[in-house]
Amino acid sequence: MSAQHLHSCKFYRLPLEIIPLICRFLSVQDIQSFIRVFPSFQTILDSSNDLFWKKKNYELRIRRNRLLRGSYAAGVSSSAMNGFVNGTQISSTPAEREYYSKSDEIKNICGLPPGPMKVEQIGHAIDHLVSETHTVDHLGSSIKASFFHIDDVPLEWISSICMQVQSFFSPAAREAISSLKSRTTTSNLLLSLFVGILFEDDLWYFFNTLYMLSSTSAIEFAYFLDSIFTVVRTDYEHYRDPLSQTLITSCTRIHNIVAVIESPYDEPNTKGLTSEQKMIVECQLNPGEVLKVKAFAGTGKTKALLEFAKSRPKDKILYVAFNKAAKEDAELRFPFNVKCSTMHGLAYGAILAQADLPQAKLERQLSNSTIASLLSLQVAFPKANRKNNPGTPSASLVASHIMFTLNRFMHSTDWQLGFRHISKRSLEVTKLSKEKLLAYTKKLWSLIVNFEYTHAPLIPDAYMKLLHLYEFPNIFSKYDYILFDEAQDFTPCMVDLIYRQKHARIVIVGDAHQCIYGFRGANACAFNENLYPSTKQLCLTKSFRFGNSVAKYANFLLSLKGENVKLKGVQNDHAYWSSASNPNNVSGAFRFFPHTIIFRTNKELILQSIRLSVSLPKEIPIAILGSMRKKAFQLLRSGSELAHGQRPSHPKLKDFSSWGEFEVHVKNSAEEDAELALVYDMADELFSESFLSRLDNCEKRLMDSKDDGDNGIILATAHQSKGLEWDNVQLGNDFRPKFDSVSFSRIGSSRYLQEEINILYVALTRAKKRLILNDTITKLYALECGLVRFAGGILTEDQLQPGKVALFVDWQIDKFSFFYETPAEGYNLLVEANEKSVWDIFFGVLSGAWQNYIANTSERLKRSMLFIENQLFAVHDQ
């Protein structure tokens, strides 16, 4: 081709940025030929910033090196001379010819013809290796095909597991498995696992499913997939077919499994363990015995459990996690003799093994409108009645109380639905007799557990309760140990189910002080020795997350609940009291980046995000943790529509015709709906004309924020932050515990007060290096340390000795930290107890100079708190 023809070629008229895009889909041989014909494009490719082209180029270089390192001795085998090798090799090196020789041998054994291999052919290879008794090697000799045998497992059990695996499939995976043919039950299972690995996210679930049936076959299957995926990927690279992200990801994940198999990861490593952790690892249990571990925040319970499992390689262990994220994280950490699952996952598998349920029956949610429809509540509670009698409840409101009653049963250890599951408030709101409300609830339960009735979904708590009520084979019986992590977050139903496994050695791990899911039925009953006694008890008190500054405030909170065990920190940290803890004070509050603010409520989180989006410089990124932002902003826009008399568009609000109807529903609902509660709490803002524009500006600011990981503000609620940690944490201003002498004396018996303390404890223990308290918590700490530790009690003679009665004037703040200092003679306030509590003494009538300070009964508390603020916190601003 002449130079004139070259320059008249259409390629030269293409935009330059298109050239790297074209090369992404060419083989190396084609690219080399392309550059030889158009040498000027070499410079364009070298200077390209196209990430896909760079990735392609890098992968090809890595592949070449891998082929060279993994090649056998130089030479050409007989099978390397077939047309496939000659037609696709990118060079004539002995290493590459040998590689293609070996790949042809693999294809021959798998019953595949020589030539470029596609991903879908792996399914044929699996079925061939499982179903054929004999196959043929590359020399034509008959060899035994004894791959992937699963011995001593009934075919019925394999079929049920296969059904369970396929129930998790996405539509794409279902279509893929339907296109593959299997001749045996084992082949069908392996093909299902293969499709799951290829299409679904939960890789370790599919691998562990096979591992629990046959560890040898699972390892053999992993090696096979690693080899066959390498062949497929190489064939794709040599042809014009682009590498899909699914294929690249699958290759990497399978290779990671093999790497874990080959690594000495399962060897126990007690080096670096604390003495408390070693006691857990070395604890010996007999069948039926229970070890309880009280693990405070950040004390390394996961590492202790990991080494516990590694030190028992011959035992079958079940690790029960609270949620899917924790389960998936555990699957990456624990050895292969550990089955990781959630309680709902175990129940789900058990139910599906017994019945082939349609997808409609397996929906995860049951809305109030669906319940009302199932029970025909619209007929019993029509809208017309509410117009004539405003006190008449709506069908949706009654449905919420029926579901609340059913939830109390499903979360309990009870065997039958009864009057004990009906709350007094439900009877008051619904205006139903307890017999009628119980009848509605029983009918709903019967519809849910009727496997043939698809209109009432079998929600997760329902199949969990079924597992509790009925014995299912082979769910727990095959395990020697059960590790029950985050036990404080499980419902009594789940805890009781674990404790009934008398054949196993049970390890209960958690922190009762982090029980903050009371609205889900959790009550930390696993740590109640009266209900569930243990054989042995151990503690983890040494926190690797923070130091003694944070630990001091954590211990203060726990002491309010009567906790005697002290938490100790090992890191360097600081706790600060900010005189201007308003997050809008950029210069004062945000001295450390990245910076996380934890709030008690969603309302305060949204309000602060709106304020910060205006007050913070645009260079400082702002982010709301999780999916809260999108949901909240959509709800609030729809809530604004409702507040201004318009028909709301959001599905959760569309059934309300007016704000008044919505308000009545929220106030009288059986359980708080966090999303509806947010709209209700934001009522003042929603009625404002300017709110929507401020909300839009905030959302735009959040979307425009690009956090580089080193400089930004993260906003979260305490519930969202559980299990996470950050260097710098600030408590939001909505943490405002309001205690008096009566409420302090009731902390031990009040579930509400205990959970409020738990939420605050969770929030402040997220800090690793710096914790910034708000004003209210700081004052509460001063109040407790100076006074309230004697609230409700009588001072003993020993406690009245000088230096032992720490009242407010004995406490100062130095560098934002509290310390006790015995004041100089003449300044220590000694009072005459006269068998009264210190609280009553301080806020009661005192003698001497204090008479001028205390004016009258109604002003005592107000003036006393003002005095505390002036005396204790004034030095901060000096």
UniProtKB/Swiss-Prot annotation:
GO MF term set: 3'-5' DNA helicase activity; ATP binding; ATP hydrolysis activity; single-stranded 3'-5' DNA helicase activity; single-stranded DNA binding; ubiquitin-like ligase-substrate adaptor activity
Biological processes annotated in GO: DNA recombination; double-strand break repair via homologous recombination; mitotic recombination-dependent replication fork processing; protein ubiquitination; regulation of DNA recombination; replication fork processing; resolution of meiotic recombination intermediates; SCF-dependent proteasomal ubiquitin-dependent protein catabolic process
Localization in the cell: Cytoplasm; Nucleus
Domain F-box: 8-56
The reaction(s) this protein catalyses: Couples ATP hydrolysis with the unwinding of duplex DNA by translocating in the 3'-5' direction; ATP + H2O = ADP + phosphate + H(+)
Pathway: Protein modification; protein ubiquitination
Cofactor(s) required, per the database record: Mg(2+); Mn(2+)
Keywords: ATP-binding, Cytoplasm, DNA damage, DNA repair, DNA-binding, Helicase, Hydrolase, Isomerase, Magnesium, Manganese, Nucleotide-binding, Nucleus, Ubl conjugation pathway
Top-level lineage group: Eukaryota
Enzyme class: isomerase
Classification via SUPFAM superfamilies: P-loop containing nucleoside triphosphate hydrolases
EC number: 5.6.2.4
Quaternary structure and interacting proteins, as annotated: Part of the E3 ubiquitin ligase Skp1-Cullin-1-F-box (SCF) complex. Interacts with skp1 and ssb1.
Annotated family: Belongs to the helicase family. UvrD subfamily.
Protein task: Involved in ATP-dependent DNA-unwinding in a 3' to 5' direction, and ATP-ase activities stimulated by the single-stranded DNA-binding protein ssb1. Essential for viability and normal growth of stationary phase cells and in the absence of either srs2 or rqh1 DNA helicase. Involved in DNA recombination repair of strand breaks and stalled or collapsed replication forks, on the rhp51-dependent pathway: promotes rhp51 filament dissolution from stalled forks, thereby inhibiting homologous recombination and preventing excessive recombination.
Name the UniProt record assigns to this protein: F-box DNA helicase protein 1
Species assigned in the record: Schizosaccharomyces pombe (strain 972 / ATCC 24843)
Recorded name of the encoding gene: fbh1
